[in-house]
Amino acid sequence: MAYFMANATRENCQDECRLSPNRDAVEEDLKKIGVECTKVDFDDANVQEDLDQLIKKYNMNYHDEIHICRETMPNFDEKLKIFFEEHLHDDAELRVIKHGAGYFDVRAKDEQWIRIPVRRGDFVFLPPGIYHRFTTDRSEDVVALRLFRNNPKWTAFNRSENGDKQPIREQYLKDVSA
């Protein structure tokens, strides 16, 4: 379950970083910012049908797989630092976790961070223009299926005046204010 989180630094970002006392973020909190989460059962014989339904629902036409692992990913620390930098994209970000665990952090309307723990079978939809970041947990081993509408552009706009002035950010803010 997602929760509002304490401040995470590069040194502790792979920990839970829960507030004390804990404050859960319910489905309505995520819905207000356009984030959707569901489950995909990889142990079900019909898993491909479930994936095909998600692909159709979100009009995705391209997918690939990423393995984020200290042992296999070149420049792991550098990559994880980039993933954890607060940023946004022009396109939606859709991920299905096939193996391992990590955290997606997203900004609530009041700028607080909401942490979404993800494990095998978790699906996350982040709308275009939302500020977010990602990190593995301490296992440092995640395999994710990435779904895209088109071939990925991989353009990230870090949180700054530059990111705030992106047309997709302005559209996102209008969408979540409606």
UniProtKB/Swiss-Prot annotation:
What exactly does this protein do?
Catalyzes 2 different reactions between oxygen and the acireductone 1,2-dihydroxy-3-keto-5-methylthiopentene (DHK-MTPene) depending upon the metal bound in the active site. Fe-containing acireductone dioxygenase (Fe-ARD) produces formate and 2-keto-4-methylthiobutyrate (KMTB), the alpha-ketoacid precursor of methionine in the methionine recycle pathway. Ni-containing acireductone dioxygenase (Ni-ARD) produces methylthiopropionate, carbon monoxide and formate, and does not lie on the methionine recycle pathway.
Q: Which domain of life is it from?
A: Eukaryota
Where is this chain's protein located in or outside the cell? Answer: Cytoplasm; Nucleus
State any GO CC term.
nucleus
- Chief location of this protein within or outside the cell: cytoplasm
Similarity comment? Belongs to the acireductone dioxygenase (ARD) family.
What Enzyme Commission number(s) appear in the record? 1.13.11.54, 1.13.11.53
Q: Does the keyword Oxidoreductase apply?
A: yes
Q: What is this protein called?
A: Acireductone dioxygenase 1
Annotated positions binding Fe(2+): H87, H89, E93, H132
Co-factor remark: Binds either 1 Fe or Ni cation per monomer. Iron-binding promotes an acireductone dioxygenase reaction producing 2-keto-4-methylthiobutyrate, while nickel-binding promotes an acireductone dioxygenase reaction producing 3-(methylsulfanyl)propanoate.
Metal-binding as UniProt keyword: yes
Q: Which UniProt keywords apply?
A: Amino-acid biosynthesis, Cytoplasm, Dioxygenase, Iron, Metal-binding, Methionine biosynthesis, Nickel, Nucleus, Oxidoreductase
Cofactors (names) = Fe(2+); Ni(2+)
Gene3D superfamilies assigned: Jelly Rolls (2.60.120.10)
Question: Which residues are listed for Ni(2+) binding in this entry?
Answer: H87, H89, E93, H132
Which pathway is recorded for this entry? Amino-acid biosynthesis; L-methionine biosynthesis via salvage pathway; L-methionine from S-methyl-5-thio-alpha-D-ribose 1-phosphate: step 5/6
Which reactions does this protein catalyse?
1,2-dihydroxy-5-(methylsulfanyl)pent-1-en-3-one + O2 = 4-methylsulfanyl-2-oxobutanoate + formate + 2 H(+); 1,2-dihydroxy-5-(methylsulfanyl)pent-1-en-3-one + O2 = 3-(methylsulfanyl)propanoate + CO + formate + 2 H(+)
Q: Which species is this record about?
A: Caenorhabditis briggsae
- GO molecular-function terms, A-Z: acireductone dioxygenase (Ni2+-requiring) activity; acireductone dioxygenase [iron(II)-requiring] activity; iron ion binding; nickel cation binding
**Any one biological process term the GO annotation gives:** methionine metabolic process
